[in-house]
C-alpha cells in the first residue's frame, strides 16, 4: 500500500460521524413537571388579572369628577395644544424646506 493511500484511509475514518452521546437520565428534564409549572403560572396570571380588574372597577366607582375638574383638564389640554402649535410654527419658520405644518 502506498503512503498516499494510507493517508486517504485515515481521512475517510475521520470523516465518519461519531454517534453523539445522549445526556444522562439525570440531566434530562422530566416532562411531567413542565405542565404543572405552566398551570401554576397560568393560575397566578389569572388571579392577578382578576385582582387588577376588581381594583379597576373599585377605582372607577370611587372616582367622582366634578365639572370643575373636567373644565380644568380641558383648559390644560387647550394650553398644551397652543404651546405645541407655537413650537411647530417657530420650527417651520426656522426651516422652511417643508410645507406649512398642520396645526391642531
Curated annotation (Swiss-Prot):
Disulfide bonds: none annotated. It is found in: Nucleus. One of its GO terms (molecular function) is WW domain binding. The keyword Cytoplasm does not apply. InterPro entries: TF_A-like/BEX. Residues 9-31 have a biased composition (Basic and acidic residues). Keywords: Nucleus, Transcription, Transcription regulation. Its main location: nucleus. May be involved in transcriptional regulation. Belongs to the TFS-II family. TFA subfamily. This is Transcription elongation factor A protein-like 9.
Amino acid at each position: 500500500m502506498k503512503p498516499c493511500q494510507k493517508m486517504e484511509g485515515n481521512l475517510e475514518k475521520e470523516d465518519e460521524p461519531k454517534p453523539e452521546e445522549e445526556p444522562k437520565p439525570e440531566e434530562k428534564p422530566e416532562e411531567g413537571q413542565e405542565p404543572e409549572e405552566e398551570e401554576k403560572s397560568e393560575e397566578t396570571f389569572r388571579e392577578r388579572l382578576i385582582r387588577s380588574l376588581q381594583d379597576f372597577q373599585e377605582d372607577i366607582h370611587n372616582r367622582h369628577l366634578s365639572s370643575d375638574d373636567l373644565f380644568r383638564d380641558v383648559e390644560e389640554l387647550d394650553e398644551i395644544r397652543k404651546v405645541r402649535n407655537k413650537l411647530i410654527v417657530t420650527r417651520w419658520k426656522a426651516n422652511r424646506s417643508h410645507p406649512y405644518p398642520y396645526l391642531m
